[in-house]
Regions:
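Conserved GTP-binding G-domain of TRAFAC-class P-loop NTPases and closely related GTPase folds
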Residues: 2-14, 31, 108-168
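The Walker A (P-loop) glycine that initiates the GxxxxGKT/S ATP-binding motif of P-loop NTPases
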Residues: 12-18, 366
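Active-site neighborhood of divalent metal-dependent phosphoester bond hydrolases
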Residues: 129-131, 214-216, 228-304, 309-312, ...
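N-terminal active-site segment of His-dependent metallophosphoesterases
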Residues: 160-236
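ATP-dependent NMP and nucleoside kinases share a basic, alpha-helical "lid"
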Residues: 43, 47, 82-122
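Conserved beta-sheet core of the metallophosphoesterase superfamily
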Residues: 347-388
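Active-site environment of divalent metal-dependent phosphoester hydrolases
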Residues: 191-193, 227-230, 256-260, 318-320, ...
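Conserved substrate/cofactor phosphate-moiety recognition/catalytic segment
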Residues: 19-75, 85, 111-114
Length: 388
C-alpha cells in the first residue's frame, strides 16, 4: 500500500501491543518526529513499562507534540491508540494547530501480536491485554473518520506492512516554488470590462476571454469574482481559462463560495449581488454552469508563494495559519476575523487582524474596501471601493 501523508500532519499509529508500530515508525519517519508513549513513560519514571506513569507520560507527549506542530513539524504518535478516548486529544491537537490528522492502523491478527509479546520479556502483562487491544481496535475502526481523521490507512497483514511505503506531499496551498513576478488582483465582482482594461494596462494580451501574460508573469486573483457587476460569467470564463492555462492562480472569496452553495442546491440568502449573478448564469449552458461549480469547488483557501515570503488570501491570513489546512483556516481566508458584534446595518464588525500581524511573510488580501492601498505590518489590502 502506498501511504501518502501531508508534509505537516499529526500521524497516529493505531494497533495492539505487538503489532509492530515502533518498527513501522522507525522505518518510515525521522527519529525526531516519533513521540513514543513508552519513551515518555521512561522519561518520567525510568521505566517504559510502568503503566502507572501513563497519564504523566501522555501529558508530556501532548506538550511536545504541541510545540512541534506550532513550529510546523510533523508529529508521529507511537502508542496503541486503540480506544476513541485516547485518540480524541490527538485530533484536538491537530485541529488546534490547523494540521491534518492521519491514522495508520496496524490491524494484525491477535495471534501474531500475542506471539511477538511472548518473545519480549518486557511485555509480560498477560494475553488478556492484547486481546482487549484487538477488541477495542476493531470495535472503533470504522469510526476513525467520524472522529476527525482526514486520512485512514489500514494494514491487515505482515506482508502489507512490509510492502507499505510512506510518501509525503505538500499541502495544496504550498506554492513556494512559484516566484513570480505576480500581478495580484482582488475583488472583481463581475466587472469584466474593468478587469480586461487592467490586464491590458499591466501588459497582458487580451482577446475576449483569452489572455496571454507578459513573459514570466502570473496573475493572482484574490476571489470575489462574482456578484454586483454586469458580467460575472465572462469574469469566470477569463479567470477559469487563465488558471487552466497555468497563467494565473485564484483563491476563493466569500461571494464565490456563496454562489457555490447555491449551485449545489443549498438554501442561501439572495443578497449582496447574488441575484444578478443568478440571472446572468441563467442565460448560460448547463455545461458551463457545471464547469463553474467544479472550478469553485476546487479553489484552495490561500497560497504560500515565493519561498514562503508571500501569502495571498481573500480576507487575509494570520501567521500561525499560513500554509496549514483546517476549517478555521478556510473560514479566516474567506471572512477574516470578526468581533462577534454587528454594526447599524446588521453587518459583522470586522477585527483588524492586520494591526496585530507580526509574521515574516507579506500578506496581500482584499475583502474589505479601503480608501487607498496601505502597507501595515507586512500586509497590503489593495481593494479600493468603486461604484458599480
Amino acid at each position: 500500500m502506498k501511504i501518502t501523508v501531508p508534509e505537516l500532519a499529526l500521524v497516529a499509529l493505531v494497533g495492539a501491543s505487538g503489532s509492530g508500530k515502533s518498527t513501522f515508525a522507525r522505518s518510515h519517519f525521522r527519529p525526531t518526529e516519533i513521540l513514543s508513549s513508552d519513551f515518555f513513560r521512561g522519561l518520567v519514571r525510568d521505566d517504559e513499562n510502568d503503566q502507572s506513569a501513563t497519564k504523566d507520560a501522555f501529558d508530556v507527549l501532548h506538550y511536545v507534540a504541541a510545540k512541534r506542530l506550532a513550529a510546523g513539524k510533523m508529529v508521529v504518535v507511537d502508542a496503541t491508540n486503540v480506544q476513541p478516548e485516547s485518540r480524541k486529544p490527538l485530533v484536538a491537537l491537530a485541529r488546534e494547530y490547523h494540521c491534518i490528522p492521519v491514522a495508520i492502523v496496524l490491524d494484525l491478527p491477535e495471534r501474531v501480536c500475542q506471539d511477538r509479546n511472548k518473545s519480549r520479556p518486557d511485555r509480560d502483562f498477560g494475553p488478556h491485554v492484547v486481546r482487549n487491544h484487538v477488541r477495542s481496535l476493531r470495535q472503533s475502526l470504522r469510526g476513525l473518520e467520524r472522529e476527525g481523521f482526514r486520512h485512514v490507512f489500514v494494514l491487515r497483514s505482515e506482508e502489507e506492512i512490509a510492502a507499505a511505503t510512506v510518501t509525503r506531499e505538500p499541502l495544496y496551498n504550498d506554492r513556494k516554488a512559484d516566484h513570480g513576478p505576480f500581478d495580484i488582483i482582488g475583488d472583481i465582482h463581475g466587472c469584466f470590462d474593468e478587469l480586461t482594461a487592467l490586464l491590458t494596462k499591466l501588459g497582458y494580451a487580451v482577446d475576449g476571454v483569452a489572455v496571454r501574460p507578459p513573459e514570466g508573469r502570473k496573475a493572482v486573483f484574490l476571489g470575489d469574482l462574482v456578484d454586483r457587476g454586469p458580467r460575472s460569467p465572462d469574469v469566470l470564463r477569463l479567470v477559469m481559462g487563465m488558471v487552466a492555462d497555468g497563467t494565473a492562480l485564484c483563491v476563493p472569496g466569500n461571494h464565490d463560495m456563496k454562489l457555490l452553495r447555491k449551485l449545489r442546491g443549498r438554501d442561501v440568502q439572495i443578497t449582496h449581488g447574488l441575484a444578478e449573478t443568478r440571472e446572468q448564469l441563467a442565460g448560460e449552458t448547463p455545461e458551463f454552469v457545471a464547469q463553474v461549480r467544479a472550478f469553485l469547488d476546487g479553489l484552495v483557501s490561500h497560497y504560500v508563494l515565493d519561498g514562503g515570503k508571500l501569502v495571498v488570501a481573500h480576507a487575509g491570513m494570520k501567521a500561525e495559519m499560513q500554509g496549514r489546512g483546517s476549517g478555521k483556516v478556510r473560514d479566516f481566508a474567506l471572512y477574516g476575523e470578526t468581533t462577534g458584534e454587528t454594526d447599524e446595518f446588521g453587518l459583522p464588525v470586522r477585527h483588524n487582524w492586520a494591526a496585530e500581524y507580526r509574521g515574516a511573510a507579506t500578506v496581500v488580501y482584499g475583502h474589505t474596501p479601503v480608501p487607498a492601498p496601505e502597507w501595515l505590518n507586512h500586509t497590503l489590502n489593495p481593494r479600493v471601493p468603486r461604484v458599480v
